[in-house]
Amino acid sequence: MSGTYNNSSVQIYRILEQTRHIRLDDTSSESKAKYSKAKIASAIGLLSHLRDLTEILQNLRHVRESSALADVLRVCIQPHDLGGLGLDDASDLAAQQESEVLFLVSAWLEALNSEDRARSMPAPVASRPPGRRGMTLSEKIFAWHEVAYRGWVAPGDLIRVDVDWVIASEASWAGMETTYSDLGKPGIHRNDRFWLAGDHVVDPRIRQIPKVRALIDASERAKRVFKLTEYQGMNYTILHTEFYRERAQPGMLIIGSDSHTCSSGALGCLAIGLGAADVTLPLVTGETWVKVPESISIRLVGVPKPGIGGKDVILYILQQLKRNTVASDRIVEFSGAGVQYLSADARFAICNMTAELCGITGIFVPDQITRAFVANRRLQRHKNLITYFRPDNDAQYAAELDIDLANVQSFFARYPRPDDVVPVSDYAGMQLDGCFIGACTTTEEDLILAALVLEQGLKKGYRPVNHGKRKMVPGSLPILHRLRELCLTGVFEAAGFEIGVPGCSYCVGMSADQAVSGEVWLSSQNRNFENRMGKGHLVSSATVAASSFEMKLTDPNDLLCGIDWARWMSLRGPFGLTARMSAASHLTYVEPNNSPAFSQERPESSIFSRSTQEPPFSGPLRGKIQLLGDFIDTDALAPAEFLMDMKTNEQSGLHCLQHTHPLFRQRTLEGFNIVVAGQAFGCGSSREQAVMALLGCGIKCVIAKSFAFIFQRNMPNLGLLGITMPNESFYAAAKDGSEVSIDLLAQVIHIEGLRFVFQLSQMEQGLYRHGGITSAFRKFGNRLFEELTAAKNIGTSHMEEKCHAPSALQW
């Protein structure tokens, strides 16, 4: 072992020299004896060696390198359940453990290089510049991240923005890796800002299945190739859970290949879900494009009843606003006097289900609760880039609404619509086949409250009936660790619950846990679309817990009334902190800097061509109309049970709408290849297979009253023409089977002798012209977004050969 250790010590020195060009032998002659390689190598134990090297680098004023190695040490000694390796100085390290330590040293030092290559952002300023328009919270974050650094933006602006983090699951990475390969494997922007979590499909019970093994291998390959600093492997956490708890910081801009990326908005950062190809580009380039959306303001007022958390609050908001109404394709900003009663965990649940409102994302104005939450983190690097913004008093919102938290009670969202919300008492006694407490919506706070509800039931003599299934899945291993510390896992088990590994479990229904067709489930998850989880109804974790004893829908109020709320508050810890419990000090809010001269361009990629020749359209697009309705969701377009086999457009098309519109595919083959639909087409998840399935069927164009935000971006990325047509006269003329002609050059639709004008955005035009986002990157490289967002009259012309849609698994 000593020989292995000495070799590892030499390798650490070599990594330092090769990665950061630091040679300790190049120090002054006075320091050589003290800081020589031989001196360092004499330390006993690899971790002791690292500790000495950290101190030496600090003394030699290599502060960043010293800090990086200090972080490596913290990761090494942290318990596995808290994201570490669980090592200690007193034990000899096995060869595999030494190899992992060396990997971390290499990865964290390489992170300094990627940070050096990144474009610096100008410091924010203390006050609003004179004459600048009033901005919303989200507009300020966009303005701060805009590459041009104008210091302001307005709705409708097409801008390039720097991205702070990219996040993906093992399932969505499968498609992103394909896109990455199609781009020529150009490398990623920052190896310390890619959060990759195994949660959607992987499960210890099915790891041996080849398709699951392939997902694991792809993620492990990403870890090695990119030298990821933040990789925790499979079933450590649900994608959003530990990212929000330990990484997202106020003021950041985060892009993720999952529709519930919006969850991190709880901390005052802008977190937006997109499709796999759309997310791969900022992973590579460090930037993306945004057409600045409108925002709505929801002011939370009143005081919630004890035991009412974020899940019931967002169900109430869904009841009041409904899907695809005022929040559709807009950012939802939460503020108001009532937020002081909502913990960070409660805010997380509310932002999480902004996706079900059809909003782009949700975001809370940061406050002292936010600050206290972030301050509790383990690593300094994840709490030292905080920037607090708040909306101006004269900010312009598309709508401003009040929600009274005093009106919130235990609610029940009936299958198959998350906005079909009624009080639990209206359906009390409904027979259930399964009770599930889990999914990303369900926070640590929710699990603790569910355990206390179960505890009250057990004290009253309630016992679980023999029939039915009960499953509790924690959002992460740190949460499970906390529940064990609080002696609450035993409560779940005593109440008949099986405790699973962290993952999406029954929510997405792609892994070992799947509801049987026809079963009636009660779940604390976020989505209950048709063909997703049997007949799934949505409630809070407390309601699931109360209902689990008799397998009948039960209002939890009686059991909630028996809880000792002082104990409840003590158990919640920092994740359940509210304003009344936190230090009453003021935050320092800042403003985006107006520094256009500060803008720096990144080096161009070496894999693109400067050719600008663009052939004209060969003629109008013709076909026959196939009518569909409102809310055609991604679960219907690309059913979850077939996603792992959807490697190509053709494979995806085999199952398009087969559950909801079984004749759709055959009619497409018969020439009904122009879809005309209603509101919110493509709502639901970020999965690109929904677009791939339409392309694979032979659909040439989708015309709708409105599209879901992510789906609308996915269409031009993959080469499917999507047209938003608000004109009601068009729908009066568009009969099923009608002949239609679409002139893309003139942007006109001809039908039944009538003429209807449509518009494509500048970015849509550019992507169509170049054949999709992959082809555009091959042409422009890292200057892709600069080229396609440049202020110019793009016009439209013939699409180049469509890019091959990647095999992506997103939810």
UniProtKB/Swiss-Prot annotation:
UniProt entry tagged with the keyword Iron-sulfur: yes
Gene: acoC
Name of the protein this chain belongs to: Putative aconitate hydratase
Record-listed [4Fe-4S] cluster binding positions: 440, 504, 507
One Pfam family matching this protein: Aconitase_C
Residues of the signal peptide: none
Keywords attached to this entry: Iron, Iron-sulfur, Lyase, Metal-binding
A GO BP annotation: proteinogenic amino acid biosynthetic process
Domain of life (superkingdom): Eukaryota
Induction: Very low expression levels near the detection limit.
InterPro entries: Acnase/IPM_dHydase_lsu_aba_1/3, Acoase/IPM_deHydtase_lsu_aba, Aconitase/3IPM_dehydase_swvl, Aconitase_4Fe-4S_dom, AconitaseA/IPMdHydase_ssu_swvl, IPM_dehydratase_rel_enz, IPMI_Swivel, LeuD_type2/HacB/DmdB
EC number(s) reported in the record: 4.2.1.-
Family: Belongs to the aconitase/IPM isomerase family.
Sequence positions that bind substrate: 258-260, 527, 532, 686-687
UniProt cross-references to CDD domains, sorted A to Z: IPMI_Swivel
Any GO molecular function: iron-sulfur cluster binding
